[in-house]
Amino acid sequence: MADNENRLESILSRFDADWTASDEARREAKNDLFFSRVSQWDDWLSQYTTLQYRGQFDVVRPVVRKLVSEMRQNPIDVLYRPKDGARPDAADVLMGMYRTDMRHNTAKIAVNIAVREQIEAGVGAWRLVTDYEDQSPTSNNQVIRREPIHSACSHVIWDSNSKLMDKSDARHCTVIHSMSQNGWEDFAEKYDLDADDIPSFQNPNDWVFPWLTQDTIQIAEFYEVVEKKETAFIYQDPVTGEPVSYFKRDIKDVIDDLADSGFIKIAERQIKRRRVYKSIITCTAVLKDKQLIAGEHIPIVPVFGEWGFVEDKEVYEGVVRLTKDGQRLRNMIMSFNADIVARTPKKKPFFWPEQIAGFEHMYDGNDDYPYYLLNRTDENSGDLPTQPLAYYENPEVPQANAYMLEAATSAVKEVATLGVDTEAVNGGQVAFDTVNQLNMRADLETYVFQDNLATAMRRDGEIYQSIVNDIYDVPRNVTITLEDGSEKDVQLMAEVVDLATGEKQVLNDIRGRYECYTDVGPSFQSMKQQNRAEILELLGKTPQGTPEYQLLLLQYFTLLDGKGVEMMRDYANKQLIQMGVKKPETPEEQQWLVEAQQAKQGQQDPAMVQAQGVLLQGQAELAKAQNQTLSLQIDAAKVEAQNQLNAARIAEIFNNMDLSKQSEFREFLKTVASFQQDRSEDARANAELLLKGDEQTHKQRMDIANILQSQRQNQPSGSVAETPQ
């Protein structure tokens, strides 16, 4: 019991120190929320005005709404980069899981509430919790959910020694729950507490924080970070031979089982480990003490507006604080003018009592008579005036009011420009790029809030990843969301056997260390709208009927949204895949590409048919020329043989002749031989000229065929796709 009291005393002492350190900034933030959401007439302002009518002419709300809309229109994507040996594909799976959980309804509500409070009060927050995936008694699978924290400026109290915006250096944090007695009963049932143990005033205390009021019970969740050294055992895997590490606390019940499985302990180390514990307290008792939760970070994500420190005290503000004075002045001027109009609807005349004696009821202002009566004479028969003596002049609106009203309104609107509407500027005659540049200048006013939200989302990603390491420890199926919004089912911790090495491998093991960072930019839908506008502009500058025009038109079709355009979008997607421009992503799209390639191979183009005809004709003529060459060679061989035969006969005749006639016959043979040689050379020259002519004709036709074939190959592959009209 004494330990419990000491524990409570320690927690409440730290909490009071944190509460006191942030009291001034918290009070200003609460006033900003009240001014923006409830009433713009503060109680102290009543001392300085006697107006009977007090209107609220709000120009702050459009500014807040504009900033909130811009923050929602430009979502922040949380990305992971693997480190310390983590697998890149596991980082992609982790990012897909994060997107899926962020699409949950409670996650959107939590972030939207925090963003609105960031803009109005300068600070907001949400929390990450774990919950069971389903109510099956055989399943212990847990998922991560986000919960909103309303009025975070007064319900989330951080460690006063924390100096970082994301509070990653905070050693403790307190979340306060304000509830009625019925709310206490529900809270006790949720956390398995005794509902009859209601906090009361039976133990007087002098704590700064008002733990109890007449109708409200305050319950606090106290988170604290504990860093301590733990023993880690390093084993050698009997299958892979690689070292694996386990914390002694995690495997204390299965150490013998690991030894029986063949795991060999090779070393042990002392490692510094962060753990987070949660305690539930009231002002009188510690209801639950130091319960270990998943992850190694406090699961509270703060998001600040304009943030800093002044004399070691944390200060923050939103846009409302800068607009309060101008808004108050505007309300007073407008209310003053309205009060004048309401209290003096028309001029009132002055009469002598004798003028309306007996007719006073006609001038009480309650009835509207068609005519009014006056006395002509008094009681002494003296004539009386027949008209009012004078009129009560209505108070006029001071000219300074118009100037002050304009100045007050401008002061409020200067805090945040509402931007430029394309249709409202010169009837839509201003260029689209010019309007975008003007809006980009207006967006610079929200950049501080957007950048601080990116810091908060980065912190959310770090907390999410640390919780994932603890709760996703068994094989299970999860749904991941890709960057374009499509979904895919994957299995975590899937074990497969590498057929090449025979070793087991674990796929999609997301347990590891990752570097978290954010990407601030337009949403996927906004990028599609911008791409459509740019493609439309290019279509107007590209000649119709060209392959480039067809490609741009098909790309534009793929970016269409809404009902009734599914057929056009699918048609364009199929055409782009068949053209080879877009890579197939699904088995169906791969089948489209295969069919297009087969159709392309089987289709006979007229130009190609003509080229093939020229090629075959050239080949036939070449064969004909070769046959002619062979024929000439055969004829030459026959002539040579005949010449040899004739030479033999001549030699025989020459040997049988007389010596006196041999000299004459020899001269005759020389003359005949010279004549035959000249004829042979002429025939050979004619044959060579014939072959050269055939070869030149064949070469020209082959060149024509090659040119046609190269033109066919260089023609864009889009020619097989239909041209959309």
Curated annotation (Swiss-Prot):
Its main location: virion. GO terms for cellular component: viral portal complex. It comes from Salmonella phage P22 (Bacteriophage P22). The keyword Chaperone does not apply. Keywords: Capsid protein, Late protein, Viral capsid assembly, Viral genome ejection through host cell envelope, Viral genome packaging, Viral penetration into host cytoplasm, Viral release from host cell, Viral short tail ejection system, Virion, Virus entry into host cell. GO terms for biological process: symbiont genome ejection through host cell envelope, short tail mechanism; viral DNA genome packaging; viral DNA genome packaging, headful; virion assembly. This is Portal protein. The keyword Metal-binding does not apply. It is found in: Virion. Changing V303 to A/T/M/Y: Overpackaging. InterPro entries: P22_portal (IPR032427). The gene is 1. Homododecamer. Interacts with the terminase large subunit; this interaction allows the packaging of viral DNA. Interacts (via C-terminus) with the head-to-tail adapter protein gp4; this interaction participates in the head completion. Interacts with the scaffolding protein; this interaction initiates procapsid assembly, thereby ensuring incorporation of only one portal ring per capsid. Interacts with the capsid protein. Coiled coil: none annotated.
